[in-house]
Swiss-Prot record:
SMART domains per record: MORN (SM00698), PIPKc (SM00330)
Annotated GO MF terms: 1-phosphatidylinositol-4-phosphate 5-kinase activity; ATP binding
Keyword Repeat: yes
Chief location bin: membrane
Spans annotated as Activation loop: 661-682
Subcellular location, record wording: Cell membrane
Alphabetic keyword roster: ATP-binding, Cell membrane, Kinase, Membrane, Nucleotide-binding, Repeat, Transferase
Protein name: Phosphatidylinositol 4-phosphate 5-kinase 3
One GO cellular component, as annotated: plasma membrane
Originating organism: Arabidopsis thaliana (Mouse-ear cress)
Reported consequences of knocking out the gene: Basal shift of ARAC3/ROP6 and ARAC4/ROP2 positioning and broad lateral localization of D6PK in root hair-forming cells leading to basal shift of root hair positions.
MORN repeats: 58-80, 81-103, 104-126, 127-149, 150-172, 173-195, 196-218
Annotated EC: 2.7.1.68
Amino acid sequence: MQETVFLFTEENLNKEQSLGVKYKQSSRRVVPMTSCEVSDTAAEIRIVEKVLKNGDLYNGGLSAGVPHGTGKYLWSDGCMYEGEWTRGKASGKGRFSWPSGATYEGQFKDGRMDGEGTFIGIDGDTYRGHWLWGRKHGYGEKRYANGDGYQGNWKANLQDGNGRYVWSDGNEYVGEWKNGVISGKGKMTWANGNRYDGLWENGAPVGKGVLSWGEEKTSYNGWGRKSKKKDEEIVQNHKLSSVETLSANTNFPRICISELEDTGVCDHVEASPYTSESDTSGCGEQEWARSPLLLESGGAMSVQQSPRWLDEGDVKKPGHTVTAGHKNYDLMLNLQLGIRYSVGKHASLLRELRHSDFDPKDKQWTRFPPEGSKSTPPHLSAEFKWKDYCPIVFRHLRDLFAIDQADYMLAICGNESLREFASPGKSGSAFYLTQDERYMIKTMKKSEIKVLLKMLPNYYEHVSKYKNSLVTKFFGVHCVKPVGGQKTRFIVMGNLFCSEYRIHKRFDLKGSSHGRTIDKDEGEIDETTTLKDLDLKYVFRLETSWFQAFINQIDLDCEFLEAERIMDYSLLIGLHFRESGMRDDISLGIGRRDQEDKLMRGNGPLMRLGESTPAKAEQVSRFEEETWEEDAIDNSNPKGTRKEAVEVILYFGVIDILQDYDITKKLEHAYKSLHADPASISAVDPKLYSRRFRDFINKIFIEDK
C-alpha cells in the first residue's frame, strides 16, 4: 500500500508573510514508502521509545510499523504532537505545539484538525470551536490580542453566516458575514449608543437602512440618499464617535479579523513508515524519516509533497511532471516566481475597482535578476522579465470566485513541480496542471490575450451577476520573457475536473460534426482522452430543477459570448459512473458511496451547477454525422438504440471562449465550405454558432420528468 503524504506545519500567516513577500513555515513530512497493511483485528500494538537518525523521538504505540494508539512525537526542531494515532495518522484527541509557543489541543481526524478544538497563537489570539479538514469551520469563538472578539459561524477559516463582533472600544456588530467581511443584514452599534441597522456589502452599508442616535432616526432608501431634507441636515451636523459623518465614504470601525493575519496551524499530522535496509520482509522493524527541508528562493522553508491518496485505485494523470532537465523547467520556475510575486504584491489591495483597472495598457513589467532585487527574490534560473495584465481586476475575480489568496499561491508556487501536457485540441497550446489539480495554466497566443482583455469589463460584470455562470473562470493573465528569448503569454484558470470523484469519460462538444471525432483506435482511448461530438454515445437526463437551471444558464452564457463576437467554444463534460460495470469494476468505500447517494437524492454537500451535478446517462448507439443536423433528433426520442439509463455525476463548463470571428476564421469557413456542408463546420458566425450550440445542448440534455 502506498502511504499518503503528511505534514506537520506551523505557518505564520501575517498578511505580508503568507502572501509571498516573506513568510515562515516549518513543515513536517515523512517520505511515503511501501509498508504492510494494518489489520483492524490482528495488528499487535507494541510500546516503543525510538530515537531516529535525524534526531526525532517517538514514544508510544506501534502497530505494523506505524504509530497506533497513543504516542508522543518530538521533532529535533522542537515541534511536538502528543495524543491518539490511527494507522500512522493523528486521529482522536491530541495536542500539537510549536517552538514559537503556539498550540492546538482538540480533535484530529486523518492527520488534520477536525472536530472541536482550541488554538492559541503566539500573540495570545485564541480560537475555540469547530474545525473541518484543518480549517475553522462551523461555530467558533475567537479572542484577538488587541481585545476584539468574534462569536459566530465560520467557513474555510473565514467568518461566514451569522456572527457577533465586538471591538475593544465597545463598538459592536451583529448580523451576517460572507467570506470574512460584513455582508448581508446586520446592525452596527457604537459605544455611545448610536446605531445603524440595514444592509451591508463588503464591510460598508448599501441599500436600505436606518441610522439612529438618541431619539433621532434617519431612513436610507439607498446608501447616501436620505428620505427627508430635514434628516439630511441633521446627519450632516452630527458627528459619531467612531466614524466620520455618515456618507458614501464613511469609515467604519476596522475589523481585525482577516484570517490572513492569523497565526497558522498544524496542516497535516501523519506518520509514514520507512523500511530499513536491513528489513527484507517489509513488515519488521521500521523507522520514520522526513525529507530534508528545502530552502526556496523566497526564503521559505518547505517540503515536497506527493500526490494525494486516491480511493479508486491507480488513476492515470495527464501529462508529465516538469523536473530539472525538462526543456520547460526554467519556464515553470519563472512563472512560479512571477505568480508568487504578483499575488503577494496585490493581496492587501482591497480597494474598489476603477475603470482604469480594466485598461488593456495596465500591464507592469518586473525584472527578475538571478541575484534578486529589492522586490524580487534570488533564483536559480536565468534572468527574465515578468508582466502582469490588469492585476487588480484579477485580484477581485479571485475573491469573487472564493479563491483564498494564500492557498492559490501555495498551490501554484509551492515547491511541487507542475505537470505539463499538450492541448487535446488543435491550438498547439501547452497546459500546466498543479499537483492538487485545482488550477490549470495555459499558454496563449497574443490575439487570444487581446480578446480576453477587450472583453474583461463585460466578463467581470457577467460572472458577478450570474454566480452559476458556466464560462471559464480566469484567475490571472501573465507574460514571461527570458533575456534574449521569446515571450510566453499564459492564463491561469480553474480546472473543471478537479473532483473527489474519478472522471471516467470526458467530452469536448461544439455542436458541429465536421472532423468532430477522436483520431485514435479503441485500444488507445483511456480516461484522460478527450472525446468529441461524434464519439458521444449518451444523452443525459437531469431532474427538472437542474435541467431548467442548466438550460437557462447556457442561454445566458451564449448570449454573452455572442455579444462579444466569440465562437468556437465548447461544452466540456466529465462523467463519473456510479455503477461499477460502467467504470472498469472499480469499488468504492462505504463513505464515498453514501456521499454519492446523497448527491443523487439532491442533498449532497457539494451540489452546484456544473460541479457534482447528479444525472442519468442513457446510452444509445453511436451517433452518425447526420444525427447532429438540425431537427434530426428530438428530446424525447433520440436517434439510436436505447439502453437502460445509469446514474452519473457530471462536471461541465463552457471552455475556449477566447476565439473571436476574425478574418482568419472567416477564411477558414470559406475554405472548408468547399469540401463540407457549411452547417457542419465549427468556424461560423457567432450568432449562428450560438444558436447551433444551444440547439445541440437541448438535444443531448433532457428533462427527467
